């Protein structure tokens, strides 16, 4: 019997699809998703969603119905988890990070190590930048006992893409719960400021503005400057992260765009990171919505905190609860929200 998911629930976007496909694939449960992106101006599946679906189908030898542009219904029936090396081309500047979000949980339950070579957009709007996935997402998952490495080969920006990343993961066995409501003391604050096919001073100005904004708040940051000329088009951005003495890692990011001063990009990333540090949360808003799936799969009770109960977070909790016999608690506690669940200890 397929799990039936209403794709218009809550946030009503691609996140529902990504989480549903990931859980269907790794649990071996068929899923039917209806009303996909029904509330959006361009409803139904878009090319970058289709890449995630086809990649998940490749990794699970799945039977798929409705995988076409504009389709508002998708049926996905996985067979067996596969492993090895796979090449995935999103085409244009579809987000590599969003495809990684879909596939990472599947890789952790594959029968042997897996390598994905993914081409597309590394730093694009409405998605976590690739440096966030490398330095926050992948590192946070080690707390659950997962081993996943993301290597940046080449950056790709909107509209032409052409970026490349390599993802390598090992089977995790059973994930362990993480109980860490307090961020702890910042042990290291670092970042990457990049500019591609732009004057090198763009990356330098972004980095300086980020460092100065954090310094005013009492935080010393080391921000690497990366100026490259190997992209298909221009683009820039900043990702900052803070690691704590108890093993937490949180991030803040901003993307450059035409007409937006480099200093504004740096300050925006710094302000996002500072807001999480000020609240003492163990998760930033990006990571909070991505982590609930791993909390539910882990063995034991996980308790983490974040600064916002975003619609993405609430929607992901709803999706996970449709697939697994878990019940999340999401409660306000001062400047933070506490996310708590007793995981199932899969498999």
UniProtKB/Swiss-Prot annotation:
InterPro entries: RNA3'-term_phos_cycl_insert, RNA3'_phos_cyclase_dom, RNA3'_phos_cyclase_dom_sf, RNA3'_term_phos_cyc, RNA3'_term_phos_cyc_type_1, RNA3'P_cycl/enolpyr_Trfase_a/b, RPTC_insert
EC number annotated for this UniProt entry: 6.5.1.4
Cellular component GO terms, alphabetical: cytoplasm
Superkingdom of the source species: Archaea
GO biological process entries: RNA processing
Coiled-coil regions listed: none
GO molecular function, one term: ATP binding
Active site feature: 312
Subcellular location per the Swiss-Prot or TrEMBL entry: Cytoplasm
Keywords: ATP-binding, Cytoplasm, Ligase, Nucleotide-binding
Catalytic activity: a 3'-end 3'-phospho-ribonucleotide-RNA + ATP = a 3'-end 2',3'-cyclophospho-ribonucleotide-RNA + AMP + diphosphate
Binding site for ATP: 101, 286-289
Pfam family, one: RTC_insert
Role of this protein: Catalyzes the conversion of 3'-phosphate to a 2',3'-cyclic phosphodiester at the end of RNA. The mechanism of action of the enzyme occurs in 3 steps: (A) adenylation of the enzyme by ATP; (B) transfer of adenylate to an RNA-N3'P to produce RNA-N3'PP5'A; (C) and attack of the adjacent 2'-hydroxyl on the 3'-phosphorus in the diester linkage to produce the cyclic end product. The biological role of this enzyme is unknown but it is likely to function in some aspects of cellular RNA processing.
Stated family: Belongs to the RNA 3'-terminal cyclase family. Type 1 subfamily.
Protein name: RNA 3'-terminal phosphate cyclase
Organism: Pyrobaculum neutrophilum (strain DSM 2338 / JCM 9278 / NBRC 100436 / V24Sta)
Lineage, broadest ranks: Archaea, Thermoproteota, Thermoprotei, Thermoproteales, Thermoproteaceae
